[in-house]
Structure formats: structure tokens, C-alpha cells
Amino acid sequence: MVPHKRGKTMLKTDFRDDPGFRESTRPDAPHRSWRVAAMAACAFCAVALFARIMTYPMQHDEQFYISAGVLFDRYPLYSGIGFSHLPNVALLFAGAFALLGDTHYLLIGRLLAFAAWIGTFAALMLIARTYARGTLIGGLMIALLALNPMFLNTTGMTATNNFLPVPFMLFGLYLFLRAADRSEPSPALAFASGFVLAVAAGFKANYLLLLIPFAIAALLVPPAVPLRSRLLRVALPLFVGGIAGGLPSILYALDDPQGFIAHIVNAHRGPQLGYWSAHPDPVDPKVIGIGSKLLLAHRLWLSGVAMLTLVLLLSLVAIAVVRRQTFAPRWPLLLVGALAAMGAAISFVPSPSFPQYFTPPLPFAIVLVCLLFGSLDAPGRDLARPVMAAVFALTVITGAPLLLPALTGLAKPGGWTGVQVARDGAAIAARVRQRAGDGPVATLSPIHALEGHLPIYPHFALGQFMVRAAPWVPEGERRHYAYFVTPGTIPSLLSAQPPAAILTGMEGDTDAALEAFATERGYQPVPLSLKKAEDAKRVRLYLAR
């Protein structure tokens, strides 16, 4: 450890050398019963999360990601079905479906979402036990995340790429701290950190920007080690690990660089913005301008559990200032602070903005709470505990009413969303095969058809998202789509290859072209009552006569 004189602040190289990180007697080492209670509370929270994930209604975004996993081995990911994100989520789902069977796709996706939560809990507990020497602080960290309403909606409850990167980012952070927060850096841990961080970024392109603070830190820490040693033992292994973890994205990019950019970058700019500009929703206006994004960020970050996290952070900073004689800034604090700031910055990148885009800084803010608390001396911790207890109580009051009611769903597994959707898909498939044979089903809501093992059109493989934006895809980029279709060309496509059935009613006005074709060609409408699906009140199955 780098020594420091009273009244001066210097950068320390190892958290564990500081008195605040030594094992101590009470109150820093709580009685065993308190630790058991904290672990029991975390387990109960995990069970409640499982119940909410299993019973949360199917969302539109899941039509995109689940279908990509199901069709991964049937069509090219980008040029075939028009996937517009980095490939890791499709690879994960495809691998899980291949391993666990070709049915109950949505249920498997939800189980993976729950696994991401368990991985996140494990990463937070590891960080807490290593850098704050306490189970209770780990329980608080888990509460700040799991009881935050921003994660108890589509963001954390569904099979999408919104939450899946979080455990990988936190484990990557933990491995980096363990690799460099020592007198002799560990190349193996640095490699592992780079690998896991690259895997996280492969789920969501915006997370690539979160790698920048790690790259800078790899050149600067540990500060007591010569630059050459930092390059060889931290920066180089981190880079090599990143290349290894990022291979799926790298290989796709090298295979067709222009097509990769067209799908990953351009599809989110011109086409999507073009669609929303042409179809404004006065009831639910989309957030596009920076002013509107700032207002949305204000509403999300300065309310609820996110606000409580910020209050706790500011309180710990104030205590650190009061105890500045024994408090020294440490590079892990600076790194995690930079990650939280970068996470806040990337929240403003996508357009239009949705609430799930404003969650990236929150896990790092929670880790920062842990590191700040761990940096305090014993009197400083005594000052912090009442504030932390109050924040914990308010967090439970805020989040528990959203989380706990789902527990009743555990008693009826047959009503879980993934099970219900698979059952409805099988019923739809039985009707189609009985009346119209094994022809393809035309639908912008493909999960039910895929759950019933019905063939679908690759043009509609990812649901409504690409079809509705297709008119704004530049002519020069349409060659990157093997099955390109716009709402205006749907009739000619279906005339050339008539569908055995048409399923509509979950995608609003985007279904209009399919419904018009079904009515014009005399398909027989069959009203359906689909449960556990978003916007499924007026579903129609049109059967060929």
C-alpha cells in the first residue's frame, strides 16, 4: 500500500490493505443471525423475482429476440431474417433451445432472464464480501437493484437483451478489480475480465462504450507498478480476452462488413426514426429530442429507488468528506464512478428513447455505494448505517408491492406465461393443420406459430419491427436483406405464396396489410382469446377456406 500522511489524500493500490477492509468485530462483522437473515431475505427476493418473471405477460420485444433464437439455424442471422443487434442474445437463445428442446421457447427465454438475475446477485455479493467485508451491504445492494421498479418491468422481466448484459458487466468489473488491485497484477484474471466484458458488449452495442473506462484503467493501474508491467500484465491480457470474448461479433463483421453496419448501426437510425416521425402517437409520444430525453431521465432517475440510491451515494460522499483525515480516494472508486457516468451518457444515445435505456448506470451506482462504504473507517461506517437502514426500508416499501403479488403465481405453473403461450401455440397449430394443412402462417407475432411448430415467412421472422420500418431503408442497403418486404408489398408476397393461415391482432395498425389480404381473399376469421400476451384482446386467426 502507498502510505499517506495525515490530512493528505493519495491513491491506494489495494483496498484490502486499508483498515476499513479488515475483518473486525461488531459492528463491522454482524452477528451470524443477521447474516443468515440477510441471506434468507435475498433468497426470498430471488423467489419473488422468479415468480414475477414467470408470470409477466409476453411483450412485443420478445417476438424479436425469441424468434431470432428459434430461427438461428434455419436462416442467416443478418442477411436472412434481418437481425439488428449484436449476435450474442441470438446465440444464447439458440444454444439454450438446442440444449433444452424445441418447445416452450418463451419459457426457456424467461428462465435465462432469471439466470441473469441470479448471476447479478452473485456478482454483487462477491464485490460486497471482497470490498466491504459484509453480507449485509451485499443484501442492500441486491435490494437496490431487485426492488427498483425500473427493473421490474419489461427491462428485467422479459427475454430480451436489456438485462442479460448486466451480470457479465459486473463479473467483468469484479475480475478486473481482482486482477489489478494488487501489488502483482494477475494476467489470467485480466484475460478473464476482458473475455467476460466483451461477452456483455456482444449482447447490446451501446455497452461497447462501457469498455472505454476499462481500457484507460488498464494503462494506469496499479499505479505503483511500472508502465511496462501494466501493459504486459493488465492491458495486453485484457485486450486478448476481449478479442476472444468478442469473436462472434468480430466474425460476423468480417464476413460482411457493409451488411453488418447496415443492420447494427444504420437500421437504428434512418429507418426507425423515419417510421416514428411518420407515425406519431399523440397518446404515447415518442422521446426523440435531447430535451425530451432529459425530462425522461429526470423522471426516472430522480424518483423511486433510483433517487434513494443517489441519496445514499451523496450521503456516503458527505461522510467521506467529514472523515477526510482517514479517507483516501482509491482508483477502483474512480473506475466505478467513470462507469456510472458513462452508463448515464449512453442512456441518451438511442432514439427514440424508452425507459429501459436509462438503466445502465444503476448497477454501477450500486457498486459505488459498496466501495464508498468499504472505504470508510469504523466511525464513518457508524455514521453511514442509519442512512443505509433508512434507504433499505424505503426501498422495500417502494419495490415490494410490485414484486410480492407475483408469488401467488408460483402455485399454478400451468398459468406461467411461457407455459400458456406454448399451450396457445399448440392449439393454434392444431386448428391450422386440421383446416388448412401445413402451409406457412403469415403473422407479425411469430412466437405462437413457432411454439406450435408451424412454418412462417422469413420476411416476418422478427415481428413488426423491421416490416414497419422497411419503407425507410435506403435502396442501396436493401440488398443486405434476402427477404425484404414493406407493408405495401405484402399482398404480392402472399399472392405468390398463399398462407395456410393469417394471425393478427397483437401488432396494432401494422397488422392492417395482413388483415386486408385475409378479408379480400375470403379467409375465415376465428376470434381467439390468447392469455399472457401484450395487446392480445382482439386476436384473429384467419383460415384458408
Model region roles, listed by residue range:
Residues A132, L170-A192, L219-V225, L295, ...:
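Membrane-interface transmembrane helices that cradle and orient dolichyl/undecaprenyl
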Residues W34-V36, F121-L147, V166-P167, L334:
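Transmembrane-helix signature of polytopic, membrane-embedded enzymes
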Residues S84, F195, N206-L208, G304, ...:
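Short periplasmic/luminal acceptor-recognition loop of GT-C membrane glycosyltransferases, typified by
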Residues M54-A68, G80-G95, T103-L107, P257, ...:
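Extracytoplasmic catalytic/substrate-binding loops of multi-pass membrane glycan-assembly enzymes
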Residues T155, L170, F203, L209-I212, ...:
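Hydrophobic/aromatic-rich transmembrane helices and adjacent perimembrane loops
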Residues V234-H279, A345, V349, H448:
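Membrane-lumen/periplasm interface segments of specific transmembrane helices
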Residues C42-A43, L111-A132, L147, L152, ...:
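Transmembrane-helix motifs of polytopic, lipid-linked glycan transferases
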Residues I142, P187-A205, L211-I216, I243, ...:
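Membrane-interface alpha helices of multi-pass inner-membrane proteins
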